[in-house]
């Protein structure tokens, strides 16, 4: 086995997965990983059982909105299993030889983390399914009458697949995962714990009220909380403040155009477009996305989960619809027929 707990990034394209500037804030063990309690408890049991049997951990499927810690958790799993980990994403696999090179280079009980696993090409996915189940690879050498199939044995490895779109993962691939976990948006209390922990790492003194205000504006997402914490640190430094207060956080949020509900300018653009251009809806996600200059994927993956969680948008079988809360938040008057329709949808 190679160096235990080593992290290997398979291409420079993975920088978005594991930003070095964020590395110092990433928890390394379960104890420091805040939130996702059920996910942690379940994985801890399976990891302990695998270690006691001396076996590789079963394949793990992680799903949920971006920025919630799926990549971080994969690294923690590797640490807890005393295993090396290779981190990559599905678009990095262009040809069969790409996946063959990676799989044959794995160590016994090591971990391969593939982000955006729903984007695997069909031929790559087929090869990966065989590797996950049989720990073998069939590789065709030559062409025509001279073609022959070579079977290559693989070490017992663990694949951790992550996606923001579990519905786009094919049934054959999903069935190969023995452990599945869904990440949910974090509560304010959980984000406050993360902010307090990371403020210590960044050598920032932050008041309790300030931490809560920052958490409330982080869209239930640790990645956003960390980014905002860094920007608030900049403001405190420039203003000569030794302590981050709620006033400093308020100044920073105003500069970043983030309101008291954690909505940024694009969130408000989405709600305005839904209300003013489409009379509050319902409207299809593709049409709504075009109206605000976004892709349907970015609207569904990044913006909608938080807007739905906060009660600004309802997702119906006819499309997206603004709630009464959205009208109130933007100080827009709701028509009588829209009030009746919203009450009917809510009921």
Swiss-Prot record:
It comes from the Bacteria. It is found in: Cytoplasm. GO terms for cellular component: cytoplasm; Holliday junction resolvase complex. The keyword Nucleus does not apply. It is an enzyme of class 3 (hydrolase). Homohexamer. Forms an RuvA(8)-RuvB(12)-Holliday junction (HJ) complex. HJ DNA is sandwiched between 2 RuvA tetramers; dsDNA enters through RuvA and exits via RuvB. An RuvB hexamer assembles on each DNA strand where it exits the tetramer. Each RuvB hexamer is contacted by two RuvA subunits (via domain III) on 2 adjacent RuvB subunits; this complex drives branch migration. In the full resolvosome a probable DNA-RuvA(4)-RuvB(12)-RuvC(2) complex forms which resolves the HJ. Belongs to the RuvB family. Has 3 domains, the large (RuvB-L) and small ATPase (RuvB-S) domains and the C-terminal head (RuvB-H) domain. The head domain binds DNA, while the ATPase domains jointly bind ATP, ADP or are empty depending on the state of the subunit in the translocation cycle. During a single DNA translocation step the structure of each domain remains the same, but their relative positions change. This is Holliday junction branch migration complex subunit RuvB. It comes from Borrelia garinii subsp. bavariensis (strain ATCC BAA-2496 / DSM 23469 / PBi) (Borreliella bavariensis). The gene is ruvB.
């Amino acid at each position: 086995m190679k160096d235990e707990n080593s992290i290997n990034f398979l291409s420079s394209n993975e920088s978005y997965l594991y930003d070095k500037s964020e590395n110092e804030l990433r928890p390394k063990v379960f104890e420091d990983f805040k939130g996702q309690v059920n996910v942690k408890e379940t994985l801890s049991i399976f990891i302990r059982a695998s270690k006691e049997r001396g076996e590789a951990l079963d394949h793990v499927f992680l799903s949920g909105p971006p920025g919630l810690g799926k990549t971080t958790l994969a690294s923690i799993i590797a640490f807890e299993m005393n295993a090396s980990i290779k981190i990559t994403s599905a678009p990095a696999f262009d040809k069969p030889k790409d996946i063959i090179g990676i799989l044959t280079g794995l160590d016994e009980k090591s971990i391969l983390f593939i982000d955006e696993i729903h984007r695997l090409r069909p031929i790559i996915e087929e090869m990966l399914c065989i590797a996950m189940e049989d720990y073998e690879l069939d590789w065709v050498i030559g062409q025509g009458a001279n073609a022959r199939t070579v079977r290559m044995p693989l070490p017992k490895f663990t694949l951790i697949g992550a996606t923001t779109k579990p519905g786009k993962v094919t049934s054959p691939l999903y069935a190969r995962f023995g452990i599945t976990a869904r990440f949910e948006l974090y509560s304010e209390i959980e984000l406050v714990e993360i902010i307090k922990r990371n403020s210590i790492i960044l050598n920032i003194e932050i008041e309790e009220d300030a931490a809560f205000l920052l958490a409330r504006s982080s869209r239930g997402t640790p990645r956003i909380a960390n980014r905002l914490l860094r920007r608030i640190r900049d403001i405190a430094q420039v203003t000569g403040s030794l302590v981050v207060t709620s006033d400093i956080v308020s100044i920073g949020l105003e500069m970043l155009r983030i309101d008291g509900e954690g909505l940024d300018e694009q969130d408000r653009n989405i709600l305005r477009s839904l209300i003013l251009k489409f009379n509050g809806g319902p409207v299809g996600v593709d049409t709504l996305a075009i109206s605000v200059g976004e892709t349907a994927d970015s609207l569904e993956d990044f913006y909608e989960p938080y807007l739905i969680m906060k009660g600004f948008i309802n997702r119906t079988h006819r499309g997206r619809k603004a709630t009464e809360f959205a009208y109130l938040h933007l100080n827009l008057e709701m028509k009588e027929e829209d009030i009746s329709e919203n009450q009917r949808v809510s009921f």
